Amino acid sequence: MIELKSIFQTYKGPTGPVEALRGVDLQINPGEVYGIIGRSGAGKSSLVRVINLLNRPTAGQVLVDGRELTSLNGDALRVARRDIGIIFQHFNLLSSRTVYGNVALPLEIAGLSAGEIKARVEPLLDLVGLSALADRYPAQISGGQKQRVGIARALANRPKVLLSDEATSALDPETTRSILGLLQQINKEFGLTIVLITHQMQVIKQVADRVAVIDAGRIVESGPVIDVFTRPQHDTTRSLIAEIVPQDLPESVLARIRTLMSAGHPEEGQLLRLAFAGDESDRPLLSDVIRRFGIDLSIVHGQVDEIQGKPFGSLAVFARGAREQLNAAVAHLRGAGVHVDQVDGALPGGLAGGFSHVQ
């Protein structure tokens, strides 16, 4: 549905050229919800504005539904843009128009008759739950309702793609969940491809199928959301998901582990982080490892959550036993689909708050 090929975007800055995008390659499938996440200044908004050519890239190709937008100009580009709706953080509603009038605006510009406009606008207002507010003005409705107007307006031309540029960043958590639920409903009912630009991992966790992490204008990691959350490969990704899947252990937990490791036990101790998702969480893997390899396991920290109804989580486990048995247990867990990280350093003095990434 959407393909970006070697996209570069350079702007003029006060001290010289600024490279906002540096060789971005991206492929988004029809009907999926695709998240693009990064810190402020990473290039997220530049990327979303390239998709509909609000900003024409300095180099590279943009293809949407098989058409190369970068080869279009004038009327041909304006017609192609009707297949791409967009919603913004600050709503961008016309204060002089009612809710109905704001949704009708793109249809008026497209030249539809009053009857055709009514036939489209009324179902859209019903879809977003604003039929009773059709005659109100933006100043008379809440922020969440304004964003619902923005969504209805973005859908007015029956687009194939919906771009969401930080659309929930100005909303409270409850309203954010409501708007994301509406986007999920639209995606499922109409098969609409949705691209979510955000700095909030909670947004990605709730609705996205796949995600790309952007940093300094480059895509540094991408994949299914559940894989990226449970097996982050890049430092930027680990930092972004820390609010949902903590990457460091609390000091109180580290203190208990130091006590365990310095207890003078004759068998070796090892701290492991186990990351699991989906069906892996339903199997009695820890009890199986204890029975099979004769080692002791103590859960010292853990968290379990869900991504779109699928369980995922991580456990910090202190394992004690003979080195050969510990290695065999780790190999067994990895073979069962559990991602296992081992802490750097076997002695208390080498114990740190983070996990290494030994595969």
From Swiss-Prot:
Domain ABC transporter intervals = 2-241
What Gene3D superfamilies does the record point to?
Answer: 3.30.70.260, P-loop containing nucleotide triphosphate hydrolases
Does the UniProt entry include the keyword Plastid? no
What this protein catalyses is: L-methionine(out) + ATP + H2O = L-methionine(in) + ADP + phosphate + H(+); D-methionine(out) + ATP + H2O = D-methionine(in) + ADP + phosphate + H(+)
Pfam families associated with the record: ABC_tran, NIL
- Which keywords are on file for this protein? Amino-acid transport, ATP-binding, Cell inner membrane, Cell membrane, Membrane, Nucleotide-binding, Translocase, Transport
Q: How does it sit in the membrane?
A: Peripheral membrane protein
Per its UniProt record, what InterPro entries does this chain match?
AAA+_ATPase, ABC_transporter-like_ATP-bd, ABC_transporter-like_CS, ACT-like_dom_sf, MetN_ABC, MetN_ABC_transporter-like, NIL_domain, P-loop_NTPase
Localization, UniProt:
Cell inner membrane
**Which EC number applies?**
7.4.2.11
Q: Which GO terms describe its cellular component?
A: plasma membrane
Q: MF terms per GO, please?
A: ABC-type D-methionine transporter activity; ATP binding; ATP hydrolysis activity
**What broad class of enzyme is this?**
translocase
Q: Which residues bind ATP?
A: G38, R39, S40, G41, A42, G43, K44, S45
- Predominant place of localization: membrane
Q: Key word Cell inner membrane present in the record? A: yes
Quaternary structure, per UniProt, is:
The complex is composed of two ATP-binding proteins (MetN), two transmembrane proteins (MetI) and a solute-binding protein (MetQ).
Family from the record: Belongs to the ABC transporter superfamily. Methionine importer (TC 3.A.1.24) family.
| Role | Part of the ABC transporter complex MetNIQ involved in methionine import. Responsible for energy coupling to the transport system.
What protein am I looking at?
Answer: Methionine import ATP-binding protein MetN
Source organism per UniProt: Polaromonas sp. (strain JS666 / ATCC BAA-500)
